[in-house]
A protein has these predicted regions:
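An N-terminal, globular interaction/scaffold subdomain
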Residues: 24-146
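Beta-strand segments within the central parallel beta-sheet cores of soluble alpha/beta enzyme folds
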Residues: 331-338
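Conserved phosphate/anionic-ligand binding catalytic regions in large, soluble enzymes, centered on
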Residues: 302-317
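Structured, contiguous alpha/beta core segments that scaffold functional sites
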Residues: 112, 119-197
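Intrinsically disordered, low-structural-confidence terminal and linker regions
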Residues: 1-19
Length: 349
């Protein structure tokens, strides 16, 4: 056996082990709690963000806006100008979510007071965390309505959901994921089925746990009308599933893909914690009339962890309902699937 053949064999063995780690994962939602109470190493005056490391000077506009929103949410500043100066001063520390077992959608900002989903991989004992998915602050909006949404999550919705989760002793996510994939979700841009299944699972336990009526009604209204609610859970489940596959010597399996609006980064199992980065691309998708790709910001978010474990774009042909939104066609989605299958066949040959 030549040296090259020996290395190739070691890579194949390592990759089988890495993929087995992902496939045998058992992600279970066990809690929702303030990030500062459950994320190891998260400190006051620290904000976690999506993608590879980035400093204030190199953050895109949406990422900066989201940071301002967090500072106002935490009451570290009284207004946006004060928040900007504080962020620029270096007093606030920026760290990637992936360095703290966490993920976040779009800007992905997480701070100490923000409740996060807590997902435990029962197979390996590791945990992963994800913040709330919402449509304002994570896109860079720091207006009063955006901040009010974060406060409702902190003060009403998360505590109510937590009581339900604890009442039922945790919620296994793999059965929901499996059902949703067969119901037209791909668990990244479409999680309608998964969100509905989740809402059905939590409604009864919240009532049994004695959630006060006003909070119960508000939370039920929230979870039954939030089609992307489960995205935060699929992201946390993906992170909890991928992390045990990291650190396997010789493995070439990608265990993280993430973007911060400036750079796109990946981490490879056998190469430790190093990030391999390139400029974050602009998405070739659908735009409102009068807008083009030139008006768009660069790609951002940790949600590509869903693709990392094989969901999202890799199962797009099974989620035809989302094709008109993302701008693709069934033929293109089938091409992606066939390419993935061909690559797997070549790996096995």
């Amino acid at each position: 056996m030549t040296a090259i053949e020996d290395i190739k064999q070691k890579i194949e063995i390592a990759n089988v082990e890495a993929v087995k780690c992902i496939n045998t994962a058992d992600p279970v939602l066990v809690d929702i709690a303030p990030a500062g109470e459950v994320i190891p190493g998260l400190q006051d005056r620290m904000i976690l963000h999506s993608g590879p490391p980035v400093d204030w000077q190199h953050m895109c506009g949406a990422q900066r806006g989201a940071m301002i929103g967090v500072v106002l949410f935490e009451a570290w500043a009284k207004n946006a100008d004060e928040a900007s100066k504080l962020l620029e001063s270096g007093v606030i520390k920026f760290e990637p979510n992936h360095h703290y077992q966490a993920v976040g959608p779009m800007a992905g900002t997480i701070s100490v007071s923000m409740p996060v989903w807590v997902v435990e991989n029962r197979t390996f004992g590791n945990r992963a965390f994800c913040r709330q998915v919402e449509g304002r602050q994570q896109f860079g909006d720091y207006s009063d309505p955006a901040l009010e949404g974060l406060r409702l999550w902190r003060d009403v919705w998360a505590p109510s959901l937590r009581k339900g989760i604890l009442q039922m002793g945790g919620l296994p996510l793999k059965p929901i994921i499996a059902k949703a994939l067969q119901m037209g979700d791909e668990l990244h841009n479409r999680s309608v089925a998964a969100s509905s299944l989740f809402a059905n699972s939590l409604a009864g336990p919240m009532i049994e746990a004695g959630v006060v009526r006003d909070h119960l009604m508000s939370t039920l209204n929230y979870i039954t009308n939030h089609e992307l609610l489960f995205l935060g859970l699929s992201m946390a489940a993906g992170k909890a599933s991928a992390d045990p596959a990291a650190g396997i010597e010789y493995s070439t399996v990608v265990v993280a893909m993430a973007r911060n609006g400036t750079e796109f980064g990946i981490r490879v199992s056998g190469l430790g914690d190093e990030w391999f980065t390139a400029p974050s691309p602009r998405v070739n998708g659908l735009y409102l009339p009068g807008y083009t790709e030139n008006d768009a910001g660069a790609d951002m978010g940790d949600s590509a962890i869903t693709e990392t474990v094989g969901w999202g774009g890799f199962v797009l042909c099974g989620a035809t309902g989302i094709l008109s939104l993302v701008g693709g066609t069934l033929e293109e989605s089938m091409t992606c699937l066939l390419y993935t299958s061909d690559a797997a066949d070549e790996e096995d040959s």
